[in-house]
């Protein structure tokens, strides 16, 4: 991750096993490291592969220079994401996904990788939302990974126009993954 990594988090039930790390092979896409920080994610054996596939597909779909760049995705729990949400957004509650775009130096040192930033995704919130919305867990996880990635490459949803552009990009990327429109039947949110 672009900032110092926080200490290992226990699993979602308070145990403290070792973290698991995985990464995608280097190519024209960004190098993506997935850090499974909370063991509750072990219930979803394909979570890592799902996130990597979503990021690869998003990188292929958007007009952004991501080749050779690096990003990290932290699969965490509601408690940790609540702390991050409180610290960085002033909202003392869990959320499904947070993105932290990296500040880009004016001059990149030779040979230094360009950092896109970090994404954090909370298991319990993702599980609850998927269940409440009747969506497969991997579809919702893919959507949130894509959403987080789009924030790292400059998309936002602060205005109605931005939200429409971002949601259209999400729909197109998810369609490439064979995932139905996550906004079908919903009012637009900004």
Curated annotation (Swiss-Prot):
Binds 1 zinc ion. It is an enzyme of class 3 (hydrolase). Its cofactor is Zn(2+). The keyword Translocase does not apply. Keywords: Cytoplasm, Endonuclease, Hydrolase, Metal-binding, Nuclease, Ribosome biogenesis, rRNA processing, Zinc. Belongs to the endoribonuclease YbeY family. Single strand-specific metallo-endoribonuclease involved in late-stage 70S ribosome quality control and in maturation of the 3' terminus of the 16S rRNA. This is Endoribonuclease YbeY. It comes from Rhodopseudomonas palustris (strain ATCC BAA-98 / CGA009).
């Amino acid at each position: 991750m672009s900032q110092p990594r926080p200490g290992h988090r226990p699993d979602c039930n308070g145990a403290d096993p070792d973290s698991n790390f995985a990464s995608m092979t280097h190519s024209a896409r960004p190098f993506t490291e997935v850090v499974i920080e909370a063991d509750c994610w072990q219930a979803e054996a394909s979570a890592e592969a799902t996130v990597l596939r979503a990021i690869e597909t998003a990188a292929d779909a958007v007009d952004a220079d991501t080749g050779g760049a690096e990003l990290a995705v932290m699969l965490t729990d509601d408690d940790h994401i609540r702390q991050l949400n409180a610290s960085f957004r002033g909202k003392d509650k869990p959320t499904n996904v947070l993105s932290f775009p990296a500040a880009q130096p004016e001059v990149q040192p030779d040979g230094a990788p360009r950092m896109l930033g970090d994404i954090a995704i909370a298991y319990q919130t993702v599980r609850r939302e998927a269940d409440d919305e009747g969506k497969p867990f991997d579809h919702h996880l893919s959507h949130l990974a894509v959403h987080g990635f789009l924030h790292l490459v400059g998309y936002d949803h602060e205005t109605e126009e931005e939200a429409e552009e971002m949601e259209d990009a999400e729909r197109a990327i998810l369609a490439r993954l064979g995932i139905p429109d996550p906004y079908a039947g919903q009012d637009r949110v900004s």
